[in-house]
């Protein structure tokens, strides 16, 4: 197959949702359709051996939530789909934000009983930075749900994106009978209890068919016909250009747990979602059709293999083709490296990559030299932009139970900060170590990983820090004066960048007023 054909058949997407909307279950079912797994392990079985294939760190297994971003590749409809699983829980936004920089489209999963929730709103804001196309799956139709028209109205008003329903539900909860495909004029009938395998779905042709009344009952059939008249009058038709520009979302209804409706949005994804897109660098735009290799690192994961204490850098291929043993330039450090052992992923199972094309995600073994945001090329000096660090909102001081392990603690924290699990700050005035996170659960993750991966037992204490900003100044003399007078509020982060740590927002505002020549940044490009 030629290079353009390889690139054109790729679809790289992430699933975004509020915690517990069913994202991990959908991930499972998608893999089932892609023949990547044989039976879907029910995610609810926390104590059973059938853990969801994409949740594989120790703590995730105990809690049943996806903490790390894993990558899964599978074939579907003559396309090669790369699915980036993103942490769904409240507290993992920073990793999730960065993962959204590495995809070309997103699937938004909504719990149909609850509608649009807070985390979904935040994540959609991040996709807006790049106008990422969004598909929508209204989940949990096997439970009692809100009125479908209401759900569409809420998405449109809260998320400011037009909805184009592709399928429409027939009943819900115990009365859920299936969905009607508007464009194809076909009804797909639902059978409960078939969730862990791909079921043969009975299809009824035509909305006016008596077979439809016989299958779902007169009441539901008539209700469907009435609702569809309303829908076709009140909602938008699918418009591909508006979808590509992130202005309109095709909406599918179904139940991930019952494995029903998942294939409909997969068909939509492979047919409508964009092939690998162009990316900005600090010098030019790189097109996916270019044959020279380039890519950027958006995540670093420690110890994916419990048997090996290694770290893997996840790289999005932007252009060209990776081939085993090729020489690439690691732009930030100006060094050429031979990559002979890149990995491809199937959540927890790793395989050595012989080749990878634009749109694919590969893993590079990292012995401490690769950082988030690093660019690799076939010689060209450029840096991909738009992979930010976000100022933490929560802070704790971290302390050792055994003071002799200070060196291991620092090493563990710096490694965890490089992979984006947490941010570390070392105040200039004392030997404290302060950990900053975007959500509470990250603190638990850090303590548990320090224990299992670095054999360090640590505990947290409260610390008088409310917020942090990265500080820079073009005038060296003024910067020195600022540093001299504010030493008690300054710290170095894991990458040795100077940071202002403020005990209160009032303190930060005063500092910004007092030093107008100093730039205080809420995000920092990697």
From Swiss-Prot:
Q: Which residues form the tr-type G domain?
A: 8-277
Task: Tell me which UniProt keywords the record has, alphabetically.
Answer: Cytoplasm, GTP-binding, Nucleotide-binding, Protein biosynthesis
Q: Which family does it belong to?
A: Belongs to the TRAFAC class translation factor GTPase superfamily. Classic translation factor GTPase family. PrfC subfamily.
Describe its function. Answer: Increases the formation of ribosomal termination complexes and stimulates activities of RF-1 and RF-2. It binds guanine nucleotides and has strong preference for UGA stop codons. It may interact directly with the ribosome. The stimulation of RF-1 and RF-2 is significantly reduced by GTP and GDP, but not by GMP.
| Keyword Disulfide bond carried by entry | no
Residue sites binding GTP per the record: 17-24, 85-89, 139-142
Q: What is its main location?
A: cytoplasm
SUPFAM superfamilies per record:
EF-G C-terminal domain-like, P-loop containing nucleoside triphosphate hydrolases, Translation proteins
Entry GO MF terms: GTP binding; GTPase activity; guanosine tetraphosphate binding; translation release factor activity, codon nonspecific; translation release factor activity, codon specific
Q: Please state where this protein is localized.
A: Cytoplasm
**Any single Gene Ontology cellular-component annotation:** cytosol
Record NCBIfam families = prfC, PRK00741.1, small_GTP
Per its UniProt entry, which superkingdom is the organism in? Bacteria
| A Pfam family reported for this protein in Swiss-Prot or TrEMBL | GTP_EFTU
A single Gene Ontology biological process assigned to it is:
regulation of translational termination
Taking the record's annotation, the residue ranges forming a coiled coil are: none
The name this protein carries in UniProt is Peptide chain release factor 3
Q: Is the keyword GTP-binding in the record?
A: yes
- Gene behind the chain: prfC
